[in-house]
């Protein structure tokens, strides 16, 4: 069973640029040891007859039928716009004056 030492936890904190208190080091040491133990249990499972998979549930993408439709006219597209001019949307200037 792998166990993380306090020195390893401090080193991980240094790598992540995180200052850890003694209390946090102790808590993280326990948490990481539990995680490592759980990983070891999963690795012990007999998987010789199980094929590798990325997802245990088969995924199928639902795509709507690609049916051509009549597009909006320019007038219909700009009809709901707060401001339009000459068939184009008008938006407030977001960049400074040039």
Swiss-Prot record:
It catalyses: L-glutamyl-tRNA(Gln) + L-glutamine + ATP + H2O = L-glutaminyl-tRNA(Gln) + L-glutamate + ADP + phosphate + H(+); L-aspartyl-tRNA(Asn) + L-glutamine + ATP + H2O = L-asparaginyl-tRNA(Asn) + L-glutamate + ADP + phosphate + 2 H(+). InterPro entries: Asp/Glu-ADT_sf_sub_c, GatC. Disulfide bonds: none annotated. It holds the Pfam family GatC. GO terms for biological process: glutaminyl-tRNAGln biosynthesis via transamidation; regulation of translational fidelity; translation. Keywords: ATP-binding, Ligase, Nucleotide-binding, Protein biosynthesis. GO terms for molecular function: asparaginyl-tRNA synthase (glutamine-hydrolyzing) activity; ATP binding; glutaminyl-tRNA synthase (glutamine-hydrolyzing) activity. Its EC number is 6.3.5.-. Heterotrimer of A, B and C subunits. Belongs to the GatC family. Allows the formation of correctly charged Asn-tRNA(Asn) or Gln-tRNA(Gln) through the transamidation of misacylated Asp-tRNA(Asn) or Glu-tRNA(Gln) in organisms which lack either or both of asparaginyl-tRNA or glutaminyl-tRNA synthetases. The reaction takes place in the presence of glutamine and ATP through an activated phospho-Asp-tRNA(Asn) or phospho-Glu-tRNA(Gln). NCBIfam families: gatC. This is Aspartyl/glutamyl-tRNA(Asn/Gln) amidotransferase subunit C. The gene is gatC.
């Amino acid at each position: 069973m792998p166990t993380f030492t306090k020195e390893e936890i401090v080193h991980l904190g240094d790598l992540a640029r995180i200052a850890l208190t003694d209390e946090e080091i102790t808590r993280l040491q326990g948490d990481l040891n539990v995680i490592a133990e759980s990983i070891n249990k999963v690795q012990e499972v007999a998987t010789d007859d199980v094929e590798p998979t990325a997802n245990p549930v088969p995924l199928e993408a639902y795509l709507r039928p690609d049916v051509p439709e009549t597009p909006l006219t320019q007038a219909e597209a700009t009809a709901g716009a707060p401001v339009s001019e000459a068939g184009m949307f008008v938006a407030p200037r977001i960049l400074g004056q040039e």
